[in-house]
């Protein structure tokens, strides 16, 4: 009976390991971005879980928004780079993102300003540590910004 118990326990451990995601899969769920390297007014695109994510360091002339992430003295917008109309990837053009598919436009705060998009660009979950954000991890900054978007 003891041999059967040990064998049963060993098989349960093996089954659990098979069910758990591989470390490479877990690591693929997070992308880190150092905000210190981003130039003001020039958004950069990063890939998180196969989706483009726009990170824009705002210039002093760009409007303030409740969606702004403030790190030190700098303001940033973080948005999933897929048009909320049909999922095309908007391109940055002179202080706004323009979607070539159906003419949708988003301002520097990722808010829809023209065309068919039904809502602003989506906000990916993120956390902040110093000047580094981790996409895919919900931190207090994400929670606060997401709450303003629902209000």
How should each PLM-predicted stretch be described?
Residues 57-151:
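Rieske [2Fe-2S] iron-sulfur-binding domain
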Residues 1-3:
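N-terminal secretory signal peptides and thylakoid transit peptides that target proteins
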